[in-house]
Amino acid sequence: MIETDKLAAKAVSAERLISASPASPNEEAFERALRPKLLDEYVGQEKVRGQLDIFMTAAKKRREALDHVLLFGPPGLGKTTLAHIIAREMGVNLRQTSGPVLERPGDLAALLTNLEANDVLFIDEIHRLSPVVEEILYPALEDYQIDIMIGEGPAARSVKLDLQPFTLVGATTRAGMLTNPLRDRFGIVARLEFYTPTELARIVTRSAGLLDARIAEDGALEIAKRSRGTPRIANRLLRRVRDYAEVKADGVITRAVADAALAMLDVDAVGFDLMDRKLLEAILHKFNGGPVGIDNLAAAIGEERDTIEDVLEPYLIQQGYLQRTPRGRVATASAYQHFGLGAPKTGPARDLWDNNA
């Protein structure tokens, strides 16, 4: 049942226009076409860019493989893009895979033994590596060697294989799920942060140019403000606004055109969609602002518990519209203000069975 709920949550996330997860293979292909190729083209993440520039320049001067890199942060912020940029800037090949795909030690061994000197191996969702595969990775990262078993039963023996020097780039949205031994083997650890509206407006303007779409400065900024700090969402909204501009306007994306298009798509001024508003309005109107238990809230809005916890809540909490408390979910003053309501002077409603009430 739990696994079914998780799958349902993933399906809901993929269906949302403002989801940070890739919606389809077609969208992934679209993202690749817009992806910056070099570090100078990469917008935002100034601290991470500065660090990587220094580390890569030093590694190239010494003609060494770049130290292993761990990139973590929310989805859609450019971890995969940075992995490709690292390989291109270092002038080496990139091999890409993901944690769930590497089911057996042999899967990883096959990748490692085919790497050329200083190549980049990119493992997305690295927190989902199985323990047995992770064990193979440790000596590969430290000593550029792997131990493989030859034969079966009593006749089995371990053989040590030397590898070419390489760089592992691991990406994860859940750094806390990495084991300490794996995390400690990364020499470069970088957290990607949400983007500012100004940074996203630059990304939208660049993407519009690649798409041959005409866009005004205020139109790019309007899309950026509703993109939840995430380039993937910004590019997705740009595609839909471009369609609207070509059909309903003269093809130029102005602020007014962007506002009308996004209103049609139910994306409001702060990037909330219908599901975000449904959740907050349920807490505000049905439960007097909270606290309300997660199961009651799920029943009230007709969604699975996992969908609320994994898909809807994170952004609302991060933006300060919702709080998780020991007694349940509580709407904040920002939530009341967003819906034009006055916050209750006595605070949120208390639990009927709260002894402190």
From Swiss-Prot:
Binding site for Mg(2+): T80
A Pfam family the protein falls into: RuvB_C
Region ranges (Large ATPase domain (RuvB-L)): 4-195
Binding site for DNA: R305, R324, R329
Sample GO molecular function, one term: ATP binding
SUPFAM superfamilies attached to this UniProt entry: P-loop containing nucleoside triphosphate hydrolases, Winged helix' DNA-binding domain
Principal location: cytoplasm
Stretches the record annotates as Small ATPAse domain (RuvB-S): 196-266
EC number: 3.6.4.-
Protein keywords: ATP-binding, Cytoplasm, DNA damage, DNA recombination, DNA repair, DNA-binding, Hydrolase, Nucleotide-binding
Residues at which ATP binds: L34, R35, G76, K79, T80, T81, E142, D143, Y144, R185, Y195, R232
Region spans: Head domain (RuvB-H): 269-357
Subunit structure: Homohexamer. Forms an RuvA(8)-RuvB(12)-Holliday junction (HJ) complex. HJ DNA is sandwiched between 2 RuvA tetramers; dsDNA enters through RuvA and exits via RuvB. An RuvB hexamer assembles on each DNA strand where it exits the tetramer. Each RuvB hexamer is contacted by two RuvA subunits (via domain III) on 2 adjacent RuvB subunits; this complex drives branch migration. In the full resolvosome a probable DNA-RuvA(4)-RuvB(12)-RuvC(2) complex forms which resolves the HJ.
General function of this protein: The RuvA-RuvB-RuvC complex processes Holliday junction (HJ) DNA during genetic recombination and DNA repair, while the RuvA-RuvB complex plays an important role in the rescue of blocked DNA replication forks via replication fork reversal (RFR). RuvA specifically binds to HJ cruciform DNA, conferring on it an open structure. The RuvB hexamer acts as an ATP-dependent pump, pulling dsDNA into and through the RuvAB complex. RuvB forms 2 homohexamers on either side of HJ DNA bound by 1 or 2 RuvA tetramers; 4 subunits per hexamer contact DNA at a time.
Family designation: Belongs to the RuvB family.
Protein name per the record: Holliday junction branch migration complex subunit RuvB
Organism: Ralstonia nicotianae (strain ATCC BAA-1114 / GMI1000)
